[in-house]
Amino acid sequence: MFLGEDYLLTNRAAVRLFSEVKDLPIVDPHNHLDAKDIVENKPWNDIWEVEGATDHYVWELMRRCGVPEEYITGSRSNREKWLALAKVFPKFVGNPTYEWIHLDLWRRFNVKKVISEETAEEIWEETKRMLPEMTPQKLLKDMKVEILCTTDDPISTLEYHRKARETIKDVTILPTWRPDRAMNVEKSDWKDYVKKIGEIYNEDTSTLEGFLSALWKSHEHFKEHGCVASDHALLEPSIHFVGEKTARKIHEKVFRGKELDPEEIRDYKAFMMVQFGKMNQETGWVTQLHIGALRDYRDSLLKTLGPDSGGDISTNFLKIAEGLRYFLNEFDGKLKIVLYVLDPTHLPTIATIARAFPNVYIGAPWWFNDSPFGMEMHLKYVASVDLLYNLAGMVTDSRKLLSFGSRTEMFRRVLSSVVGEMVERGQIPIREAKELVKHVCYDGPKALFFG
């Protein structure tokens, strides 16, 4: 039965295990929500605004089905965009987006219709009547979201995180320090960015010393607002020892308007990652490394819509073990590190790294892997090579508030099914299985990130 009680639960033990975790609070240490939207607490106007306006998963699949861009990110009305989505939605079967959006519709709106061209108008009207009462803060409470960490640039004022702390009682909203722009020295806007953070923190960032001082001040500012983790996007980690003298020369070269060669770019990024590690060591933050996403691969999307518009891909040819070796040894036992890999063929590398370094944790199946298939494969491999008990937990990685419930439910069901299979095969006693799924879903990630 579609989305029935046994959805994704493939054995009797899984049903028992899911009953232990389905109502646990949600702790999400990595997502892309905007704290401003939560604080202002404005309701959505329509179902497209809820499900399609910010979701590049939806955009990509609509493009795959031949929907013109004007019905995705263009000038068409939200109603026209929803109707265009509904028309092609049956083609999404097998992709987790098909299940997520139906779960949103069935669980949050109690509108138990299958999305199609025929039902699109009814769904539009039914949800539109309900949306005035479905504010962001109410939804977060209804979905039992206890803690969420947004992703924020070091130049952020964190004004809305402060307001959230003062005014919102049911959910804790914390920032995450994401200093990618600070280390992307090859980007054309890097120098302007460096000047801006200098203006904010009253430092002469044309010097390396001033730039590092400004970053330390930003780090402290985030700490004062409850930050517990940093987040870093690394296409391919290449972290090696680089002295401050070398980094200073590179920094000054950019400010003189000179172009860097590839080795200088790698050296500067490596130097900065080590500095970020030292900052996190000082504050006890978790360091999250997202590895293997090749950003903005489709040039036309980047030019017309900008980044984060559905043009990113996964790439395989990475030297993760070699690229992380210096960083992992430099911070051995000093820093909690979570590794997320986009290509599942790299899972053996990070799983064995985690076995070698007790301070390293394996992150959740991420981005293109957060489907039932991807999660099952990930969980089974981690359980067999490392410790499933030590998994860093579930992250939504979402730009869409409504998907917190659906993505978390899918993960908990798949986890229950995987562990339930072990019970059915006689590998685990049911009592230990119950403790395991509860730990992975809630106790473990809460302890790792929030102490």
Swiss-Prot record:
GO biological process assignments: D-galacturonate catabolic process; D-glucuronate catabolic process
Source superkingdom: Bacteria
EC code: 5.3.1.12
Catalysed transformations (reactions): D-glucuronate = D-fructuronate; aldehydo-D-galacturonate = keto-D-tagaturonate
SUPFAM superfamilies assigned to the protein according to its UniProt record, in alphabetical order: Metallo-dependent hydrolases
Keyword Cytoplasm found: no
NAD in keyword set: no
Broadest EC class assigned to this enzyme: isomerase
A GO molecular-function annotation: glucuronate isomerase activity
Functional pathway: Carbohydrate metabolism; pentose and glucuronate interconversion
Keywords: Isomerase
HAMAP family: UxaC (MF_00675)
Family note: Belongs to the metallo-dependent hydrolases superfamily. Uronate isomerase family.
Descriptive protein name: Uronate isomerase
Organism encoding this protein: Thermotoga neapolitana (strain ATCC 49049 / DSM 4359 / NBRC 107923 / NS-E)
